[in-house]
Each structure stands twice: as structure tokens, then as C-alpha cells.
Amino acid sequence: MIIDRVEVETINSFSKLELLKEIYGLIWILPILALLLGITIEVLVIVWLEREISASIQQRIGPEYAGPLGLLQAIADGTKLLLKEDILPSRGEIPLFSIGPSIAVISILLSFLVIPLGYHFVLADLSIGVFLWIAISSIAPIGLLMAGYSSNNKYSFLGGLRAAAQSISYEIPLTFCVLAISLLSNSLSTVDIVEAQSKYGFFGWNLWRQPIGFLVFLISSLAECERLPFDLPEAEEELVAGYQTEYSGIKYGLFYLVSYLNLLVSSLFVTVLYLGGWNFSIPYISFFGFFQMNKIIGILEMVIGIFITLTKAYLFLFISITIRWTLPRMRMDQLLNLGWKFLLPISLGNLLLTTSFQLVSL
């Protein structure tokens, strides 16, 4: 059978078309990979910053041998955990024991889907973005409870129960604060919430319109991250390491990663909800209204927005790290009393007050 040149060219064109379709099908993965790379770098930076700040507070030198200024210390620790033996408890529930850390990590990573890191730079601009974050973040304590229960260790089980109780206690005030912000912005979308703060620059931030909600959100976020003075689920003096007691190797490393990912997510949401997100702080001055000429300027706008967002997020990171090394740990009864008897009524009153002002202004 003889094939003429026209048929050969037709076959080649079809093969090129199929190749282009495959390439186009893989393009959607690039933003996700870029986000994962950025998250990895941010976690390494946060670990290094915490060690440097804690060393400064305690008047120590801090990490200095692994790379210049100790920048590679976090990578060295991660490599060590990756190469360590993964020990399983002989009488534990092995399936639950293995899946617990994965549930905690995945639930935190999914929260990044709705965070607008910069101008037009968000993976999923959903109309229920902040509620999706609250729903997803409530899954992480289930993984911690599974880890504590499946370890067949009383310290681990108590740590898991504490994690669940702490999450429930502070999730409700956190939700009320988010609802108040949504009422002010008339939207549950994270992008719309940032846009609603863009008109007056620094003076348009929700921080000034919701000062009580900001303080409650700040305290609740620290409790959700299980940072001092709220690290009751893993109190060394009482529970050895809490739900992490029986873990080793990469699984222990995943729990270590969860704490810093949670801190990063909380910092970014403080920025998005209260500090104007990617918007420039000076009133009536915006980088994004001056240049609308080509794609290069659009990329520059996005990079500037990401830089502004991360700069604001690092402010919360600095506050949380400083609090960790300056305040003592609370007792469990004090922690629950703070959540149920103090923060919950204040956040509910703040929500009712915001609702009243919104109804009056209609």
C-alpha cells in the first residue's frame, strides 16, 4: 500500500495536534507545582527564622554550621528524619497509625487553594473560600486523634484528645470572626475580601473596622496552630510528646511539617482578612492601577503583590514566634475556659454588633 505525501502530512499534523493536547493537559499542573515549591521554601525559611529569633531571645548563637548562617539546618534535619527507621507500635492500629499524619498534612495543604497570594494569583477563587478553609482545617484534628488513639499509648491518646478539644474550643470563635469579616465585605470569597480593603490603603484594612475580631482571631489562630502558650496536646513535661510520642522517621517529620504549615496558613489568612492582602499600604497609591499594558507588567504586578502579602504574613510569624519564647504554657482548664467563657462570648458579641451596623447602614 502506497501512501502519498498529502496523507503523510495529514498524519503528521494529527500527531502534532495530539502532542499539543497532551502538553496543554499538563500545563494546569504548573501552578500547583509552583505553589508546592513556594510552600517548601517558606517552611524552610520559617524554621530558620524561628531558630534565629529564639536564639536571639535566649542570647544564644543559634544554627551556624549547616550552610552560611545555618540556612541549611532545616534541610539537614529533614534529611535525617527521612533516613531514620520508621518504627511501628507492636500493639497499635497500624492502618490508622500510618494514615494519621497524611490526613493532617493534606488538610493543611488544601487550605492553600483559596489563599490569594498576589494580584490574580489564587488557585481557586471560590464564592465560599473562607468557609472552605474552616471546613478543611477542621479535618486536621481528626488525623491527630487517629494518631493518638492508634499508638496504644496513654500519653499519645491524651494528646490526641487534647488536640480535638482544643480545636473545637477555638474553631467556633474563629468562625464568628470570619463571619464578621464576610458581612463587612458582602462576600465569602477571599479575593473579594481583599478587594474590599483596597480603596483607602492602610486605613481601609479590616484591622481598624474589626479590632476586637482581630485580637480574637489572632489568639484563636495561635491555639489552632498549637503554639505556646497553647501547646497542651504535646506538652513535654506532661505527655512526653503527646500524639507524636510513638512516631519516628518520616511520619514524625510530617507532624513537624504540619505545625509550620499551619502557622504559615494562619499568617496568610491574618493578612488576607485583616491586613489588606496584596494591597499597597499607602492610601490612593496602587501599583496595579498604573500599568495595564502587557503581560510582563502583569507578571511584575503579581510578583509585587506576592512580596507585599508575604511581608505582612511575616509580621504575624514574628509575633507568634516571639510569644512562643516569652509566655509560659497554660493549664488545660485555663485553655478551655479562655475559649468557651471568654473568646466565644466576645466573638459572638462582635458578630452581632457587626450585623447590627450592617443592617442600620442599609
UniProtKB/Swiss-Prot annotation:
One of its GO terms (molecular function) is quinone binding. It is an enzyme of class 7 (translocase). Its EC number is 7.1.1.-. InterPro entries: NADH_UbQ_OxRdtase_su1/FPO (IPR001694), NADH_UbQ_OxRdtase_su1_CS (IPR018086). It is a multi-pass membrane protein. Pfam families: NADHdh. The keyword Oxidoreductase does not apply. Keywords: Chloroplast, Membrane, NAD, NADP, Plastid, Plastoquinone, Quinone, Thylakoid, Translocase, Transmembrane, Transmembrane helix. GO terms for biological process: aerobic respiration; photosynthesis, light reaction. The chain crosses the membrane at residues 27-47, 103-123, 128-148, 164-184, 202-222, 247-267, 303-323, 335-355. One of its GO terms (cellular component) is chloroplast thylakoid membrane. It is found in: Plastid, Chloroplast thylakoid membrane. HAMAP family: NDH1_NuoH. NDH shuttles electrons from NAD(P)H:plastoquinone, via FMN and iron-sulfur (Fe-S) centers, to quinones in the photosynthetic chain and possibly in a chloroplast respiratory chain. The immediate electron acceptor for the enzyme in this species is believed to be plastoquinone. Couples the redox reaction to proton translocation, and thus conserves the redox energy in a proton gradient. NCBIfam families: PRK06076.1-2. NDH is composed of at least 16 different subunits, 5 of which are encoded in the nucleus. Belongs to the complex I subunit 1 family. This is NAD(P)H-quinone oxidoreductase subunit 1, chloroplastic. The gene is ndhA.
